[in-house]
Amino acid sequence: MDALQELLKRKWILRKEDPDLYNLVRDSVKEIRKFVQEKFGYMIIVTPYLIKLEKIPGYVEEWMGIQEFQSVQEYQMFCFVLLFLESKEREEQFVLSSLTEYIQMQFQDGVIDWTHFNTRRQLVRVLKYCLSIHIIELDDGSEEGFIKNKDTEALYENTGYSRYVIRNFAHDIMDIHSLEDIKKSEWFSMEEDRGVVRRQRVYRRFLLSPGIYRKDKNDEDFVYIRHYYRQIEKDFQSIMPCNLHLHASSGYIVLDEDCNVGTIFPSRNTISDLVLVCMQQITKKIKNRTLNVNDEEITFIEKELLLKWIRKWIKENLVFLPKKYQDMGESLVSENILATMKSYGFLDEEENRIKINPICGKIGGGFDVEVKKNVNK
């Protein structure tokens, strides 16, 4: 299912940006629509301008979200940008000041003050994200100048894609007041068929999460995985080259080396290398019982202790690192490593302690000892 792989790789496929790919996928939609609806409960949106597979997670997890955003306020600004664009026609132009005035009016009690540097920088991050997903185009000027001066102007154009950013809800969203309400509304019309709900939730979790971890011995998702292991693996292999690895308390879809669907770990960068080193060292500490695991193969550790260990592991491998990382110092690099591990869902932060998920025992690595000897010479 090459067309499905292409939809999984991207937020959407835009006809204007890649007409050949758009036509290829459009011709295959009929073939894959039934599969994604049955297995994942996903919709495929097809318009003359774009094709989008609505990828909804089985569970909302801490690391999910727009990686470019650094605050809740940026998500609020983004939603107001979408509302602003709703009133614009496709290819209609607008200036930056009209958008900033609109956003300022939407926030209550003067929360937004464009004279503040950090507030302007937040909006610039939002605008850059909007440009990256093509819901707006820059016709003249630059948003960068807005960081330095609130009176800076830029000319943008509405592409019309913004109306497809927010997913379709089956029920009135005005009745939704919490995350739990969203979860309930997702499968509201299917309550009579819990088997379908569970299957779609499991398939979504395998697709969008690094792994599925058993909550307890009666975890119904994990019971389903054990019963339908072969069918799940077969279905995912029909999408991409992979295997389902099932352990006592966790399960993973492991992609073949030549598969590049979605976000892949490890990436070819220094932080990924260091994360692998840390995961290998964590596994060693579990094996020698310095760290203990519970029945669900989860480990808890104080945050400061883990950071101390990471700094030590960085120092031991400093000779392998590019000069940029050597100059950053162990403390800053260790914080980056921790943030990266959280972003992949390898661990979660709970107040002042870290929850290390079972996947940390699944993968790991280290630098070549022989190379290190030669470097030291």
Where on the chain are the PLM-derived regions?
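Positively charged, polyanion-binding regions of nucleic-acid-associated proteins
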Residues: 9-10, 72-93, 272-300
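C-terminal structured domain segments
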Residues: 289-362
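Short acidic, hydrophobic short linear motifs in intrinsically disordered regions
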Residues: 4-21, 90-112, 203-219, 292-325
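C-terminal engagement modules used by replication, chromatin/transcription, nuclear envelope/ESCRT
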Residues: 142-180, 337-377
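A short, conserved structural fragment
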Residues: 40-42, 127-142, 237-245, 338-352
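Eukaryotic partner-binding/assembly regions in large regulatory complexes
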Residues: 1-67, 145-266
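Internal, well-ordered domain-core segments that constitute the primary functional module
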Residues: 83-156
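Short amphipathic alpha-helical interaction segments
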Residues: 27-35, 113-132, 326-340
